[in-house]
Amino acid sequence: MAAALQRIEQLSSRVVRVLGCNPGPMTLQGTNTYLVGTGSRRILIDTGEPSVPEYISCLKQALAEFDTAIQEILVTHWHRDHSGGIVDICKNISNDATYCIKKLRRNPQKEEIIGSGEQQYVYIEDGDLIKTEGATLRVLYTPGHTDDHMALLLEEENAIFSGDCILGEGTTIFEDLSDYMNSLKDLLKVKANIIYPGHGPVIHNAEAKILEYISHRNNREEQIITVFRDNLEESFSVSELRKMIYKNVPENLHKMAEHNLLLHLRKLEKDGKIFSIASPAKKWRASL
């Protein structure tokens, strides 16, 4: 069972978590959004989903409670549970200037429209520094979950805002497994102490959690390889493999499990360990 999280919680002298009020199987307790800094204007990391008035109320309450305003908005990646609240924030939380909303570009590049186009993204790059009173954030390009995903290193705390690259509970989904594994290895090199994840509770041993994620994916890959090694003459569909490998996963997570399996299969095919055939549905078998 997911740990209970307060809707507004001060996590450190410079980090306040405001829960997105959008709980679900994919979002856990909801999206974690963060106010970062110590001054009268702070950085907001992520924005939750569109049309969640409870979140806007919580964010207003947090701004009032800590006597602060939003300096700018950083979006860790394009998914709607992280970028979807931008329009509602701009519409319902007054600011003395137009909100500056920053993120990494999609890769390959594509046009991104916020709402009906009143706001536009300001694109930032890997290694950029974003500063506010009491906090310095360094942009870390961490593709894999999405092609535009970024984590942010809070230098004053040696802490990482991990977006959906690493979650406080369970594991995440990804678009490209090779990119994702490289991003995990890059985050490991940072040697951070703490992770503030995009969903779930704070992670207080960053290195152990990242190593756990890397080990989990390597173990999953080994499970898949073992199935093919033990059945050299047979071919398997994604759903057949899911029944063998994700035996205890509840039905509402079957789609996510199959998505992750498919990405493992693509990586193994790229590595030359298996090949795919159409029969008539796509299946895979071991490369002899």
Curated annotation (Swiss-Prot):
Zn(2+) 1 binds at residues 77, 79, 118, 145, 164. It is an enzyme of class 3 (hydrolase). Zn(2+) 2 binds at residues 81-82, 118, 164, 199. The modification N6-succinyllysine is found at residue 273. One of its GO terms (cellular component) is mitochondrial matrix. The modification N6-acetyllysine is found at residues 102, 282. Binds 2 Zn(2+) ions per subunit. The modification Phosphoserine is found at residue 235. GO terms for molecular function: RNA endonuclease activity; single-stranded RNA binding; zinc ion binding. Its cofactor is Zn(2+). InterPro entries: LACTB2-like_MBL-fold, LACTB2_WH, Metallo-B-lactamas, RibonucZ/Hydroxyglut_hydro, Sec-metab_biosynth-thioest, WH-like_DNA-bd_sf. It is found in: Mitochondrion matrix. Its EC number is 3.1.27.-. Keywords: Acetylation, Endonuclease, Hydrolase, Metal-binding, Mitochondrion, Nuclease, Phosphoprotein, RNA-binding, Zinc. It comes from the Eukaryota. Endoribonuclease; cleaves preferentially 3' to purine-pyrimidine dinucleotide motifs in single-stranded RNA. The cleavage product contains a free 3' -OH group. Has no activity with double-stranded RNA or DNA. Required for normal mitochondrial function and cell viability. Monomer. Belongs to the metallo-beta-lactamase superfamily. Glyoxalase II family. This is Endoribonuclease LACTB2. It comes from Rattus norvegicus (Rat). The gene is Lactb2.
